[in-house]
Amino acid sequence: MNVSVNIEHVTKEYRIYRNNKERLKDVIVPFHKNKTFYALNDLSLTAYEGDVIGLVGINGSGKSTLSNMIGGSLSPTEGDIKRDGDVSVIAINAGLNGQLTGIENIEFKMLCMGFTRKQIKKLTPEIIEFSELGEFIYQPVKKYSSGMRAKLGFSINITTNPDILVIDEALSVGDQTFAQKCLDKIFEYKEQGKTIFFVSHNMKQVREFCTKIAWIEAGKLKQFGELDDVLPEYEKFLNDFKKRSKGEQKKFRNDLDSSRFVVK
């Protein structure tokens, strides 16, 4: 089985500045130390053709950072990501321009993805039909609801037939019927042997479509393996976490995040 995505020791750091003075010092003072946040820390995993990998973890764990890196919109501070094939990222608002109409966004986004105008003209009716936006396709996207934006973004990306698909909470908004249609399309891609990364807090969807689970906690890969090996462990953790008081949940998050801040 061929490797489609190989992630090796990936780290993503963000320098934290309290004011512009600290930012300036970081530029002009050699070896100036400042607080640094590790969004991801030494994370490695390999995805093969046909893998549908669920990226799970509580909010702020690093799932979206990882999905953006796989998609290529973020670069790692350290480490390397190799991709074998075209990647398409589906996230709410991803790549959409609020000033443009829906149909203008289709052309703009597909031009950015390397499609010719002839290809775009051919695919546009299919995208509009899948989106179910009707006459709203001619309205500015800034007037769309979050569900409508998700429909447009999903329809563009799913119709371009990528080799690797990254879905980041794009099915968490919008109506249930459209979400099911999207899941049916994802299942088609799964049957075709495409590689899919699926970020969701909906454990029912994760269990139904994923073959493997990557559990991310505090920017690190806590567990990675087959669905039936990892998901029950994560669901047990999640149930225990939800039983805690808001204060206990906040303390748990703060304790995790404290390990992600260093001065360097």
From Swiss-Prot:
Keywords: ATP-binding, Cell membrane, Membrane, Nucleotide-binding, Translocase, Transport. It is found in: Cell membrane. It comes from the Bacteria. SMART domains: AAA (SM00382). GO terms for molecular function: ABC-type teichoic acid transporter activity; ATP binding; ATP hydrolysis activity. It catalyses: ATP + H2O + teichoic acidSide 1 = ADP + phosphate + teichoic acidSide 2. It is a peripheral membrane protein. Its EC number is 7.5.2.4. Residues 22-243 form the ABC transporter domain. One of its GO terms (cellular component) is plasma membrane. ATP binds at residues 57-64. InterPro entries: AAA+_ATPase, ABC_transporter-like_ATP-bd, ABC_transporter-like_CS, ABC_transpr_TagH-like, Bact_Polysacc_Export_ATP-bd, P-loop_NTPase. Belongs to the ABC transporter superfamily. Teichoic acids exporter (TC 3.A.1.104.1) family. Part of the ABC transporter complex TagGH involved in teichoic acids export. Responsible for energy coupling to the transport system. PANTHER family: TEICHOIC ACIDS EXPORT ATP-BINDING PROTEIN TAGH (PTHR46743:SF2). The complex is composed of two ATP-binding proteins (TagH) and two transmembrane proteins (TagG). This is Teichoic acids export ATP-binding protein TagH. It comes from Staphylococcus saprophyticus subsp. saprophyticus (strain ATCC 15305 / DSM 20229 / NCIMB 8711 / NCTC 7292 / S-41).
